[in-house]
C-alpha cells in the first residue's frame, strides 16, 4: 500500500509468478485498512472456499451420473449402495466440501501458516474437471492458472501427455495453444506495471536454483541419503523421475484409450504422489495437491479413503519440523509411507484387468 498499490508490481520483491501478488494488490483496494498478515491469511481462506466449491462440483457431478462406485460401469447398472460407512448420495458433495475445509493441513496451510497452496490445487481440480467433462480448453486454462500460482502444479502435467495420446480423449494437440496464451496473460499486468519480461519469464528457473538441498523437510527418498552429494543426486533424481514418468505415460496410454473421471483423478493423484517422492529439492508442503486429489477421489471411490487419510497424515507430519521445530513422526518413516501409498495407487491403476472390454476398465466394487 505504501508503493502505490498496482505499481508495486514493478518492484523485484517476489521470487514467484506475480499471480498471487495480484490478489494482494486486489485486497489492498478492497480492504485498505486490513493488516498485511490478516490480508495474506484471508486470501488463503477464500481460496480454501474455492477449493471446497470445486470438490463439491466434482462429487455432485459424480452423484448425478451415479457411477462413482465402479469405474467404467454403465449408469443403468449402478444402484444406490449407501451404507453406514458411506454417506448418502445426496449429502456426499456437501460432506466432501466440509471435509476438505476441516482437513488439518488445509487449516494450517492457509489460516495459520499464511500459504496459498490451495490456490494452485483448486485450479488443478478445476482443470481436471474440464478435461473430464468435455471442456478441454477450459481444463487447460485451469491447469495453467495453477501453474501461474505455483510451480507444483506441474506434477499434474504428465497427465496431459497421456490424454493427448489416448485415441478417445477429448484433448487434442490443437488445444495446446491455450497453455502459453493463458500463462503469458497472467504476466501482462506485471509487465504493464513495469516489471521486466525476462524476469517474469524466468521466475521458476530462479526459484529452482534458490536452495541447494536435496530435501526441505519433504518426505522424499532423499531423507535416507542425508550425506549424499547434492549435484550428483540432483541429476540422478531428475533422470529417475523423468524416466519413470515416461514409462508410466506409456503404460497408461497402452492401458486406457480414455479415462473415466475417477480414473483421471487417480492418475493425477498418482503423479502428485510419485513426483514429490522422487524429485530433489522438494518442500514440506508439496503434497498439498495430492491431499486434495486423494480426498476428492475418496468420495468417488470410498475404498480410497485410507489413501486420503494416509496422504494427509504424511503431509501433516512433514509440517512439524518447520512449525514445531522437531519431528513428530520421523521424516524417514514418512518417506517410506509415501512410497507405499504412491506405489499402491499406481498398482491399482495399472494392475490386472479383465481382457473383456479392456479399455472400459471394470474395477472391484468400492
For each of these PLM feature ranges, what is it?
Residues 54, 119-136, 293-294:
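Specific aromatic-rich, kink-prone transmembrane helix
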Residues 42-66, 75-78, 243-254:
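Transmembrane-helix motifs of polytopic, lipid-linked glycan transferases
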Residues 18, 22, 33-53, 230-241:
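Loop-to-helix entry region of an early transmembrane alpha helix in multi-pass inner-membrane enzymes
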Residues 75, 92-129, 140-152, 179, ...:
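Membrane-embedded helix bundles of polyisoprenyl
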Residues 203, 207-278:
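Aromatic/glycine/proline-enriched transmembrane-helix motif characteristic
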Residues 1-22, 26-31, 195-203:
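Extracytosolic helix-loop segments that constitute the early lumenal/periplasmic catalytic or substrate-binding loops
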Residues 200-219, 250, 268-269, 297, ...:
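Transmembrane helical bundles and short interhelical boundary loops of multi-pass, membrane-embedded
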Residues 156-181, 192, 289:
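Perimembrane helix-loop-helix junctions
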Amino acid at each position: 500500500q505504501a508503493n502505490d498499490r498496482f505499481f508495486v508490481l514493478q518492484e523485484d520483491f517476489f521470487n514467484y509468478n506475480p499471480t498471487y501478488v495480484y490478489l494482494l494488490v486486489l485486497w489492498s483496494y478492497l480492504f485498505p485498512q486490513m493488516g498485511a498478515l490478516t490480508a495474506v491469511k484471508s486470501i488463503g481462506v477464500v481460496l480454501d472456499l474455492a477449493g471446497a466449491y470445486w470438490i463439491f462440483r466434482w462429487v455432485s457431478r459424480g452423484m448425478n451420473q451415479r457411477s462413482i462406485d465402479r469405474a467404467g460401469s454403465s449408469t443403468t447398472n449402478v444402484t444406490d449402495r449407501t451404507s453406514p460407512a458411506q454417506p448418502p448420495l445426496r449429502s456426499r458433495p456437501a460432506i466432501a466440501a466440509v471435509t476438505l475445509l476441516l482437513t488439518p493441513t488445509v487449516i494450517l496451510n492457509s489460516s495459520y501458516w499464511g500459504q496459498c497452496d490451495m490456490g494452485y490445487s483448486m485450479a488443478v481440480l478445476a482443470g481436471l474437471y474440464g478435461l473430464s467433462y468435455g471442456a478441454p480448453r477450459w481444463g487447460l486454462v485451469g491447469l495453467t492458472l495453477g501453474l501461474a500460482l505455483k510451480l507444483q502444479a506441474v506434477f499434474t502435467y504428465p497427465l496431459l501427455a497421456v490424454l493427448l495420446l489416448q485415441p478417445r480423449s477429448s484433448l487434442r494437440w490443437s488445444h495446446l495453444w491455450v497453455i502459453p496464451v493463458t500463462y503469458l496473460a497472467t504476466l501482462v499486468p506485471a509487465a504493464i506495471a513495469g516489471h521486466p519480461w525476462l524476469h517474469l519469464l524466468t521466475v521458476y528457473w530462479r526459484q529452482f536454483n534458490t536452495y541447494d538441498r536435496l530435501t526441505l523437510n519433504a518426505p522424499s527418498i532423499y531423507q535416507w541419503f542425508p550425506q549424499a552429494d547434492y549435484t550428483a543426486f540432483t541429476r540422478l533424481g531428475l533422470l529417475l523421475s523423468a524416466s519413470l514418468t515416461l514409462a508410466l505415460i506409456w503404460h497408461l496410454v497402452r492401458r486406457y484409450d480414455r479415462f473415466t473421471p475417477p480414473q483421471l483423478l487417480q492418475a493425477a493423484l498418482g503423479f502428485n504422489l510419485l513426483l514429490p517422492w522422487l524429485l530433489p529439492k522438494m518442500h514440506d508442503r508439496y503434497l498439498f495437491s495430492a491431499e486434495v486429489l486423494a480426498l476428492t477421489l475418496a468420495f468417488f471411490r470410498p475404498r480410497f479413503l485410507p489413501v486420503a487419510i494416509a496422504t494427509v497424515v504424511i503431509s501433516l507430519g512433514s509440517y512439524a519440523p518447520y512449525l514445531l521445530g522437531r519431528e513428530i513422526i520421523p521424516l524417514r518413516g514418512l518417506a517410506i509411507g509415501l512410497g507405499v501409498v504412491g506405489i499402491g495407487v499406481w498398482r491399482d491403476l495399472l494392475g490386472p484387468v479383465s481382457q473383456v472390454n479392456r479399455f472400459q476398465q471394470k474395477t472391484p466394487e468400492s
